Amino acid sequence: MSQTLKTAIAVLGIDIGKNSFHVVGLDQRGAIVLRQKLSRGQVEARLANMPPCLIGMEACVGAHHLSPTADQLDLQALHRVRERLVSQRTGIINQIRAFLLERGVAVRQGLRFLRAELPRILATPPDVLSPRMVRVIEGLAGDWRRLDERIEGLSSEIEAVARQDTACERLMSVPGIGPIISSAMVAAIGTGDVFSKGRDFAAWLGLVPKQISTGDRTILGKISKRGNRYLRVLFVQAAWVVLIKPKSWERHGLKPWIEAAKKRLHRNVLAIALANKLARIAWSVLARGRDFEVRKIDEAAAQPA
């Protein structure tokens, strides 16, 4: 069955396989007007020659090249590699701390403190750290340095891309958002038009509470933590950056909102609420194509979302 000039496809469904794709088109009444089997290389050419319609496909690895642009996929690849390297570095640092603590050597929390103290610790007498353990930790420290170099290189490349992208530049006008978050957001959702409002974007990130309904009551629980974990973590980090700089609250128009929220929320809950707010602001900036504009919020209306 194939499409004719008298039939317009309203909805197109694509079943994605490794080498072949099955395409089914429906008209406005739901009747099948197209059914084809295409190779992977034929799909894009076939879609390019069709009138605009609603396209549905399964969410899988094979579908990624059909939706985001090539630039988005490249940027996502940079972020994924960087995320993996950061995770590996964290694992190495935790392992070094664990080995030291097993021998009674405690180091103040924080990456820079361990980096500064490690040479002195490794020079301690053999009764504290055996020569074998010193060699083990020196090897881990070497892995740490190599990961630092790779992470720094990827971060510099991501920042360079963000500085040349108009959408990323706009997003960086939002408090707490820099090149990493802005580029990760653009890579993930493009222009943001896949969401109808900022609340939907925040929900997709998993920054909204779960709702438990019983009878006529609705109970709000912990955040759902669904969706894009990487972006969610970045927005929470952005919220903490804003919270530890109270002098910037007034400049960004967030002071009334934060001060009202502080009175009734634990600081960790406040960080999540602010991350939700920043995500919604960021979506608005991206979707509307305008820089962040400071708008003071009345204390009476400062309800964390």
Residue ranges of each PLM-predicted region?
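A detector of single, family-specific signature residues
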Residues: M1-A305
